[in-house]
Regions:
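Alpha-helical bundle regulatory/interaction domains
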Residues: 1-192, 202-207, 221-241, 257-285
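DNA major-groove recognition helix of helix-turn-helix
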Residues: 199, 211, 250, 262
């Protein structure tokens, strides 16, 4: 029986900071589970394992993840394996969303499983609320209710402020990653060094890294089209010098070939790279 994945989009008061809350579960325990390749998408996530913990390949060994942690924004893929009994909840934040909601800087958190105690006491409280819920659906509702109450208690207008990097992020998405850092700084009205510090603080990535990830997102969306285009045409349209340039960048970010199929990334990973989600990411919705 396949994993059951459920996604609940963030309501309007949270939408500036949070994309969604999600759950993945399985009604029957399974011993032999395939690996998943989780690709960079620019979004850090709160992960709470209510059942057995996922494992992640680290230095060629499978290491069990903490029961609750922040999955720092990825600049390279994570290879993970579901446990026998799956019951996991995620809160997927937008770029800059954690800093906007909780004031926690993300500098130095990229590609890490970050202890919640290193970030923000409210994140610990949110994880506890998720753990206490009776089932996946209750956990998603409880997480959303807690986040709405947190915003109402800390913001007079009941809405999350836009992240400081929001203008630059929108410019990158609007161009689908076809923009240089100097042009991005000009679009954001910031000196380059200040923009780089802001990006590190709010996304854990440099502007250049984030640009590459958005360009990857655009590529994944095009490569998954029913009628596949010639790779050279895709490469040139995406702003690469040639197909070889695209292939090198794609391999560096995904550790797989551009010609591989999305379904090969794993039964959890395919939900994160659905065409509709990639399109929403590119549009900033």
């Amino acid at each position: 029986m396949p994993l059951r994945y459920v996604e609940r989009p963030a309501p309007a008061p949270l939408a500036a900071a949070i994309e969604c809350v999600w759950s993945v579960s399985d009604r029957e325990a399974r011993r032999a589970r395939p690996l998943d390749r989780l690709l960079p998408d620019g979004c850090p996530e709160l992960i709470v394992h209510r059942g057995d913990r996922y494992g992640r390949i680290v230095d060629r060994r499978l290491v069990r993840q903490p029961a609750a942690f922040l999955a720092g924004t990825l600049s390279r893929p994570w290879i993970v394996q579901a446990p026998p009994r799956v019951a996991t909840i995620g809160v997927r934040f937008r770029p800059g969303g954690i800093t906007a909601l909780f004031g926690a800087p993300l500098t130095g958190t990229a590609d890490r499983e970050v202890p919640l105690a290193d970030l923000s006491a409210p994140l610990i409280a949110l994880a506890a609320v998720i753990r206490r819920a009776r089932g996946p659906a209750s956990a998603l509702r409880a997480a959303e209710a807690w986040l709405l109450a947190h915003v109402a208690a800390h913001r007079p207008d009941g809405r999350v402020p836009a992240p400081g990097c929001a203008v630059a992020v929108r410019a990158i998405h609007r161009r689908r990653g076809r923009i240089g850092v100097e042009a991005l700084a000009a679009a954001a009205g910031l000196p380059r060094r200040r923009l780089e510090r802001l990006f590190r603080r709010e996304t854990a990535l440099s502007p250049k890294q984030y640009i590459r990830i958005v360009r990857l997102t655009a590529l994944l969306h095009r490569l998954d089209a029913p009628e596949r285009e010639r790779l050279i045409d895709v490469a040139l349209d995406a702003g690469y010098f040639d197909q070889a340039h695209m292939a090198r960048d794609f391999k560096a970010l995904t550790e797989r070939r551009a010609s591989a199929r999305r379904g090969d990334d794993g039964e959890l990973a395919v939900h994160f790279t659905r065409p509709d989600r990639l399109l929403r990411l590119l549009s900033g919705a």
